Each structure stands twice: as structure tokens, then as C-alpha cells.
């Protein structure tokens, strides 16, 4: 399980360090893709396969399903760590997530999210009403 929040930076070669607490669970190869809310998602291959199977079952006749599958798969890259625990982030994903230099990596149970520091701060300072969200989660049995 991925948990926690870590600050680090993109280097001049578009590499980021994956926090050591995340590396063992990720394995040697993993998936880096576009996420929702303007961040990047990182999935261990096993979790990606589970998600892939669910997405393959979505109906091709549904416009929203097709759009979501395109969004998710078009940004996906299988990547691996170098000996220093860094991963090369493709330019299209850097642009998508508006990553300049400072980044925040957060553990979100089965995935990691990579945010530009600016977007993470903005997200946390936004008018997100956690009380209202908690109430909705209660309705879902959480």
C-alpha cells in the first residue's frame, strides 16, 4: 500500500526520484500515465493489469467510456527505475502535469500520484469541502 507525501524535484534530464518507501512495492517496471486533476498516476504492473481489465470491459458504444479509455491509455508509459531510484518522465507527461521543478509524490493506496508543487498547493487550498466529501463517502459505505 502506498501512503505518505514526499517533496522532491525534477532534474535537468526530466528524471524524478521515486521515494524509497514506494520502490519495493512498485517493482522494476511500472506504469506512469496521465491522472485526473492534472497529476500523474503511477501503478505497479499488477494494479495496472487489474485496471486494464476493467477498462477493456467498458462499452465501445458509450462516448464517455471511449473518451476515458483514450485519455488513460494514450498517456501510459511502461517505465523503470535507474540505479539511483530515478525514473525518466516523458515530456508530454511533464507538460500535462505542469511540472516545472518541484514536485510532490503522494501515496494513494494502490497508486502513487505525482503533482507539480504549485498544483498540489492549489488543490489543497481550493474550495474542496472535505466535510461534504466525507458525507458522500458515508453514503457509499465508507
Swiss-Prot record:
Q: Which GO terms describe its molecular function?
A: DNA-binding transcription factor activity; transcription cis-regulatory region binding
State the InterPro entries in the record. MraZ (IPR003444), MraZ_C (IPR035644), MraZ_dom (IPR020603), MraZ_N (IPR035642), MraZ_sf (IPR038619), SpoVT-AbrB_dom (IPR007159), SpoVT-AbrB_sf (IPR037914)
Which keywords describe this protein according to UniProt? Cytoplasm, DNA-binding, Repeat, Transcription, Transcription regulation
Q: Please provide, in alphabetical order, the Gene Ontology terms of the cellular component aspect for this entry.
A: cytoplasm; nucleoid
**Which intervals hold domain SpoVT-AbrB?**
5-47, 76-119
> Is Transcription there in the keyword field?
yes
Subcellular compartments: Cytoplasm, Nucleoid
Domain of life of the source: Bacteria
**Coiled coil, from the record:** none
Which GO BP annotation is one of this protein's? negative regulation of DNA-templated transcription initiation
Transmembrane helix in keyword set: no
Matches recorded under CDD domains: MraZ_C, MraZ_N
| Cross-referenced HAMAP family | MraZ
List the NCBIfam families.
division/cell wall cluster transcriptional repressor MraZ
Q: Which family does it belong to?
A: Belongs to the MraZ family.
Q: How does it assemble?
A: Forms oligomers.
Q: What is this protein called?
A: Transcriptional regulator MraZ
